[in-house]
């Protein structure tokens, strides 16, 4: 079988024999040294080495040998897949769904889509991918979160899901999944998630397999917009933070970013400049009231940013303009309290920008001390509900002093910051590029096809 399928298989089940094989390798090494140093032991060591080599191979490969005896020589074609979600939405959920479609198409997987109309203010028809109309499919990949599953099910109808292998692609930011959403599992045969952090949260309560499937990170090419178009001087060093005001302001924590910048640089008129980009600021008052937040949260945020002589960008941009904004900055900052994945950070790294971020939650799948600047934190308990996030759960409180020190470090050593940015771009391209993501999705769908064709007994139980 192809190496890619094996990698996908063992990436899911995590075979324990690899740990035993490491021990065998160590013993083999000892035997080899004895062989080289003591001729009297030559024959005995040859026998020991041969036995250990066989033991190592048997420890690593029992599943592979069993599969090789049982599985067909050629892999089946990936089954036809329908991606259902807010495909035309100009937000993170829409971006994730479109990325899945692009990755599947690039991996030569038959794919179609069903666009669930988002709210009118979020709809951007020009974002719809060009694909054939929906035909009969074997797999439904529902790109909506647990909270919206029931509404989607009612909209599509029970017959749409009957007889299919139904997969949910969920994004979730907290370490615990609310009990009120457990019923959503009943529709699905498995759940895909974008990070190991979310995988741990959902797998703890899921009655079906939970597979970590990396999302595609491929932002639009930067448009023609320049710093001048954004009202940003050319001679300033720009720290940028972007967020959606409807994504729970307390979680995104823009005030934390402003506080860290103020501690690092005060209110400079030259040199460092903080730019904050926000979506849906006009809808915040009603949203805040629904969460029991004060109506003046955005007003306070605006005042805090003005106090450090920062720039607030509160209009909606198309994808190429957002990419141009990221490309125009010098460093990206996110002092979030938790993230299911952290798309804006990944996109900034895609463009080679040094990134400062809370060292907690989903972004740790792609951020390391070698490619970014991770901020220390302490876990704090939520004393009240914040939207879907329940009192008693935990999220991170980033260390503002440490964040300020890292901002100063980036500004003081531009060569080191640039080097980390280059490493970041390479890491994102290698692990979240279209080839890596498409190959992983294709491998998973091929495994599902093998199970459907009656080879389930030859596959590990945890698949």
Located regions from the model:
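A short, well-ordered alpha-helix in the C-terminal region of glycosyltransferases
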Residues: 402, 409, 416-430, 447
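Short hydrophobic beta-strand element within catalytic cores of glycosyltransferases
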Residues: 354-357, 367, 371-376
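Aromatic "clamp/platform" in nucleotide-sugar-dependent glycosyltransferases that forms part
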Residues: 337
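A short hydrophobic beta-strand element within the catalytic core of glycosyltransferases
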Residues: 332-333
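Conserved donor-binding/catalytic core segment of Leloir-type glycosyltransferases
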Residues: 82, 233-252, 258-262, 274-276
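Extended catalytic core of nucleotide-activated donor transferases of GT-like folds
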Residues: 64-72, 82-84, 102, 112-201, ...
């Amino acid at each position: 079988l192809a190496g890619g399928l094996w990698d996908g298989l063992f990436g899911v089940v995590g075979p324990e024999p690899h740990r035993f094989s490491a021990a065998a390798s160590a013993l083999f090494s000892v035997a080899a040294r004895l062989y080289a140093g003591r001729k009297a032991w030559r024959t005995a060591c040859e026998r020991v080495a041969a036995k250990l080599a066989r033991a190592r191979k048997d420890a690593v490969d029992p599943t592979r040998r069993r599969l090789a005896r049982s599985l067909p020589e050629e892999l089946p074609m990936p089954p036809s897949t329908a991606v259902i979600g807010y495909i035309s939405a100009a937000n993170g959920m829409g971006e994730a769904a479109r990325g899945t479609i692009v990755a599947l198409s690039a991996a030569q997987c038959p794919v179609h889509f069903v666009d669930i109309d988002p709210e009118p203010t979020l709809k951007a028809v020009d974002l719809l991918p060009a694909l054939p109309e929906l035909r009969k499919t074997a797999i439904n990949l529902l790109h909506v979160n647990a909270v919206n599953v029931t509404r989607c099910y009612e909209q599509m109808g029970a017959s749409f899901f009957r007889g299919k292998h139904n997969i949910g692609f969920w994004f979730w930011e907290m370490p615990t999944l609310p009990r009120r959403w457990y019923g959503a599992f009943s529709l699905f045969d498995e759940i895909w998630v974008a990070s190991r952090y979310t995988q741990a949260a959902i797998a703890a309560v899921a009655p079906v397999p939970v597979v970590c499937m990396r999302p595609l990170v491929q932002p639009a090419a930067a448009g023609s917009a320049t710093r001048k178009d954004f009202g940003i001087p050319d001679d300033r060093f720009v720290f940028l933070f972007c967020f959606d005001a409807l994504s729970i302001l307390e979680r995104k924590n823009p005030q934390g970013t402003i506080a860290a910048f103020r501690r690092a640089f005060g209110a400079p008129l030259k040199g460092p400049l903080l730019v904050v980009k926000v979506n849906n600021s006009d809808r915040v008052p009603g949203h805040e009231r629904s969460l029991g937040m004060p109506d003046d949260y955005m007003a306070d945020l605006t005042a805090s940013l003005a106090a450090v002589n920062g720039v607030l960008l509160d209009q909606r941009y198309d994808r190429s303009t957002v990419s141009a904004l990221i490309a125009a900055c010098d460093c990206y900052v996110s002092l979030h309290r938790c993230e299911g994945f952290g798309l804006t950070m990944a996109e900034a790294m895609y463009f080679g920008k040094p990134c400062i971020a809370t060292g907690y939650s989903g972004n740790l799948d792609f951020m390391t001390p070698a490619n970014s600047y991770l901020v220390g934190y302490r876990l704090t308990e939520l004393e009240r509900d914040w939207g879907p996030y329940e009192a008693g759960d935990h999220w991170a409180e980033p260390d503002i002093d440490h964040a300020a020190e890292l901002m100063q470090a980036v500004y003081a050593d531009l060569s080191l910051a640039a080097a980390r940015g280059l490493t970041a771009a390479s890491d994102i391209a290698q692990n979240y590029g279209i080839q890596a993501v498409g190959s992983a999705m294709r491998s998973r769908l091929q495994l599902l096809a093998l199970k459907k064709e009656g080879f389930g007994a030859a596959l590990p139980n945890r698949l």
